[in-house]
């Protein structure tokens, strides 16, 4: 149904009566004509997916009521309940000037963020905006209550309350930073995009010809840039995922995620799931499936930096953040992007009081000219600093191998995990026994002419090196706290996590922001 456009009232017009006010509210609630975008779920239907039925209370519905072309000034703001918990929302209405921002669009967003800051409410952003409304640029751009104030408030809220974003359409120019400041970004395939300049502008500036999907589309940001966390086929799926993710997070930095009734894992059979040969790959998600409550693993940034797997899960009913090396991708080595991915997730868990579980199977940080030029040391330091500074309970499990600085970055004993556990076949050391022999005896090996003699020498030295990496030695020297059969690992972790439920932060320590990737 197409909304009727009323003429702008003149100053000489009589004051509107009650019926006209009600009519104006109804017209504002209808918004524009969604029939022009049949592939999109109307914005108020998105809100129906997000909130418990009948709980949404809206603010500012009559914004720009004097101009019927701008119902609610293109944005819906207010507070509703998600599983009984109050949550603030900013939802752009794509049927009103493509969701673009004017002066009152900014004012409404600022006010709801100020309320979220005051009342410590989680915020969900349903973004679908062409950016600033250039016909109102003096209203939305330069002043104290313009777009910059929105970003200021987002940063202020970072680490204080969860901020989740569903990207249903464009998020253009400066507006692209709205999702970038959020803790999680779900993007709708073929619709969601974020970019600082359109392909047309990019061509004028740089001369390169590209498409919107290639430069700022959902799959690009989820798999290449790391700005997106997941890609969804439909609007409702993205909103439903945000609603689910809220169940893993507390209302604010002072609380803890709600516990649920424990559920047995989806799989219990290990059957040599972790191969003894360190050169044979496996999917660490199969390990996760055997440790956590069935159906509870919520992976973060699954398409980006896939050599590192991170996500939320429930273990015996309690929420835990998982940081795991992925042997099936790049042998689980840590690269620049995977270090950033882990660092941000660790910071997110620490901000919201979620214990961390590190699953180690790591050959170390990647080496070579390319990664050194990319700043692997700097990015690795970012990951180590995030892990070392996290005050939440940390638990480390060495699944198979833990070598070099990768062992440190994945929460080695010196970084004060509550416990360091190991499966029976695990090895720990500066490098593998074979690599150690090549490093220590390189000249001597090269000097042996006879092939058989050389092989015998290398084999003997390798056995010697393996003695130092032996897990019995690690247990004897108290490097590991316990060697646990895989079938008993879930129960062991659950018992240790329950024992640490009374943990508290350093007195006087305040919340910290969650730095963008």
Task: Tell where the protein language model's regions lie, with residue ranges.
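Ligand-binding clefts of soluble mixed alpha/beta catalytic domains
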Residues: 1-517
């Amino acid at each position: 149904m197409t909304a009727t456009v009323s003429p702008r009232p003149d100053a000489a017009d009589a004051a509107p009566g009650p019926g006209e006010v009600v009519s104006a509210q109804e017209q504002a609630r209808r918004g524009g004509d969604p029939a022009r975008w049949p592939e999109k779920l109307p914005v108020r239907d998105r809100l129906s997916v997000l909130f418990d039925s009948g709980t949404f209370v809206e603010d500012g519905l009559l914004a720009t009521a004097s101009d019927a072309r701008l119902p609610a000034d293109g944005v819906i703001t207010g507070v509703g309940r998600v599983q009984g918990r109050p949550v603030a929302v900013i939802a752009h209405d794509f049927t009103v000037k493509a969701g673009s921002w004017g002066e009152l669009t900014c004012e409404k967003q600022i006010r709801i963020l100020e309320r979220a800051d005051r009342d410590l409410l989680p915020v969900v952003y349903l973004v679908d905006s062409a950016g600033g409304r250039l016909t109102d640029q003096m209203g939305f751009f330069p002043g104290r209550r313009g777009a910059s104030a929105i970003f200021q408030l987002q940063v202020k809220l970072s680490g204080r309350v969860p901020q989740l974003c569903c990207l249903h359409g464009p998020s253009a120019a400066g507006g692209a930073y709205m999702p970038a400041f959020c803790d999680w970004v779900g993007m709708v395939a073929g619709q969601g995009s974020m970019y600082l300049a359109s392909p047309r502008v990019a061509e004028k500036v740089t001369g390169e010809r590209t498409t919107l999907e290639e430069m700022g589309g959902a799959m690009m940001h989820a798999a290449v840039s790391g700005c997106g966390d997941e890609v969804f086929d439909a609007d409702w799926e993205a909103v439903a995922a945000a609603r689910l993710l809220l169940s893993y997070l507390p209302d604010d930095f002072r609380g803890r995620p709600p516990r649920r009734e424990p559920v047995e894992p989806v799989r219990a059979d290990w059957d040599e799931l972790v191969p003894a040969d360190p050169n044979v790959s496996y999917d660490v998600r199969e390990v996760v499936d055997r440790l956590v409550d069935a159906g509870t693993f919520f992976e973060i940034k699954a398409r980006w930096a896939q050599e590192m797997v991170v996500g939320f899960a429930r273990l015996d009913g309690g929420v835990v953040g998982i940081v795991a090396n992925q042997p099936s991708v790049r042998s689980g080595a840590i690269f620049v992007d995977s270090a950033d991915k882990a660092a941000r997730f660790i910071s997110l868990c620490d901000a919201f009081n979620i214990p961390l579980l590190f699953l180690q199977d790591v050959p170390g940080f990647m080496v070579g000219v390319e990664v050194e030029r990319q700043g692997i040391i700097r990015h690795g330091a970012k990951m180590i600093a995030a892990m070392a500074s996290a005050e939440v309970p940390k638990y480390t499990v060495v699944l198979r191998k833990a070598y070099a600085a990768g062992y440190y970055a994945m929460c080695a004993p010196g970084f004060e995990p509550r416990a360091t556990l190991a499966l029976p076949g695990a090895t720990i050391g500066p490098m593998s026994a074979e690599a150690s022999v090549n490093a220590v005896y390189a000249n001597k090996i090269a000097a042996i002419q006879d092939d058989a003699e050389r092989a015998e020498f290398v084999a003997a030295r390798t056995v010697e090196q393996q003695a130092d990496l032996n897990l019995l030695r690690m247990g004897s020297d108290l490097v590991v706290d316990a060697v646990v059969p895989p079938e008993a690992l879930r129960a062991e972790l659950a018992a240790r996590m329950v024992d640490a439920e009374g943990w508290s932060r350093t007195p006087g320590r305040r919340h910290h922001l969650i730095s963008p990737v």
